[in-house]
Amino acid sequence: MENFHIRMGEPVVPATKFCHDADRGLLFGKAFDCRIGCAAMLEALHRLEGKELPCDVVAVLSSQEEVGHRGSQVAVHNVKPDIAIVMEGCPADDTFTEPYAIQTALKKGPMFRHMDVSVICAPRYQRWALDLAAKLGIPVQESVREGGGNNAATIQSTLSGAPAIVAGVPVRYAHSTDCISTEFDFEATVQMVIALLENIDADVIRSF
């Protein structure tokens, strides 16, 4: 590394360009966990612009989720949320995994995880969200992950804690320089988050 004048600890930026295959509805790029989640959040906010909602919405782009959910902890201290929707790019299993073991696949909608190593998502909130998706005909997937972690862990355990769920856009080869996602899953995630925000009010929050 010294021959290339690269010091330990210096950042590396993969030379990957975003690419869109409109014919197949595929999205290609780097760091979709969590760029694709951030993009879905921004698109949902854009579509909700000017609309009256039953709740106040604060959107956060937090840093360092992969190394201890540090940014979300700072956000919780500043915002003090009553409830949270965590958006991310979640791993898709539909590559070399046996069909019976696939929990998350492309073109089947956002993934709502019940738990992973870091968190058990608020059960009543999770069930309410899944029932809402079924009522509105929005496709969603459910999973229980043996690894991983996300900002819901910090949100539910910082200060007084706030109920949290995770809406993940499925991503093949997450955490790599070349990720794959789909327009279908992106759009379904945006629609689901909009539906949640249009239906969350004080009574709903108290029920969790």
Model-derived segments and their meaning:
Residues 1-208:
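N-terminal hydrophobic/helix-forming segments and targeting peptides
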